[in-house]
Amino acid sequence: MKTNFDKILLIIVFIFYNTNIFSQEKDEDDAGTANTEFIDKKERKPWSFKLAPYAWLAGTSTDVGSEKIRQSFNDLTSLTNFGFQMVAQARYKKWTLSSNLTYAKLGDQMKEGRMIIDFAIDQIILDTKFGYTIIDKFDFGDDIIRGWAMDATIGVIYWSNDIAVDADLDSPIEIPGFPVNISEKMDYVDLVVGTNIRIILSKSVLLGLSGNIGGFGIGNSSKLYWDFSFTNTFKVSKLLTVTAGYKSFNAKTESGEGEDLVKTHIKTFGPLLGVAFNL
C-alpha cells in the first residue's frame, strides 16, 4: 500500500518529466488566422501580423514506469503560481513564421509526518515553426465564402525546466544529512513537422484541423511526440477573432540505461480558448 509520501514523490517525478504541465501549447497556426481567409486573395496585403493570448484548460495522464498518475485541470492549476501563453505570427503571402510561448512558475509545499518538501519549477516551452500554404482554394461570392486551405509546417519545440527541490525535517535538533537541496535544469529540443487545414463554414466562422509529429529520438529529444487539434475561429471584427476548440498531445520519453531505464508516456488533453489581435 502506497503512503502519501510515495504519492508526493510520484507527483514530483511527474512534474520533472511533464514539460507541458500547465497547457502546453495551443496550435499557433490555427489561432486567429481567420481574417486572412475572410479576405479575397486579390485584396490581401502581402504582410499580416497577429498576437494571440490563449489558455489550454488541460488535464493530464502520465505513466512513469509502472506507475500511473492522473491529474485534472484543477489539480495542475493548483501548482501554478504564475503563467501565460502567447502566439506571435508574421505572414508574408504564402509564408508564415510563428512562435508559441508558454511560461509557467510552478511550486508547492508538501508535508508527510516531519518531512517537509518544497519544490519550485520555472518552465519555458517555445514552439517555433515555418509554414507554407500549399493549397488555397477559397471562393468569394456575393453572399457566401466557401473553400479550404492547407499549410505544411516544420519547426522545433524547445522545452526547459529549472527545478529546485528542498527537503527538511521538522525537528528541534539538527539531523545529519538535512536539509537536502536539489537543483537541476532539464531541457531538450524536438524537431516537428505538421500540417493544418482551414475550412470556411460561413462569412465569420472558420474550422481548423491541425496535426504535428516529431521528436524521433534525435539526441535527447522525445522518442515520439504527436498532437492533434480542432478549433472554431469566429470573426468578431476586422482586428479581433475568438477561438475555441480542443487539443490532445502525446509524448514518449526515456531516461537512464539498462536497469535504470525509465519510460514515460504523457497524454495531455482538454479544451482551449483564445483571442487574436490581427494587425
Indicate residue ranges for each PLM-predicted region.
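Outer-membrane beta-barrel translocator domains and adjoining extracellular loop/strand segments
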Residues: 62-68, 109-114, 143, 162-172, ...
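Transmembrane beta-strands of outer-membrane beta-barrel pores
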Residues: 55-59, 92-96, 101-107, 134, ...
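Residues on the lipid-exposed face of transmembrane beta-strands in outer-membrane beta-barrel proteins
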Residues: 51-53, 86-92, 128-132, 154-156, ...
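Glycine- and aromatic-enriched membrane insertion/assembly motifs of diderm outer-membrane
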Residues: 70-135, 156-159, 233-235, 241
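Short glycine/proline- and aromatic-enriched beta-strand/turn motifs that initiate or cap beta-hairpins
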Residues: 24-100, 270, 276-278
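Residues that define the transmembrane beta-barrel architecture of outer-membrane proteins
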Residues: 45-47, 80-84, 91, 120-126, ...
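Short loop/turn motifs that connect adjacent beta-strands in outer-membrane beta-barrel proteins
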Residues: 39-47, 135-149, 201-205, 236-239
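Predominantly the C-terminal beta-signal and adjacent terminal strand-loop region
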Residues: 27, 228-279
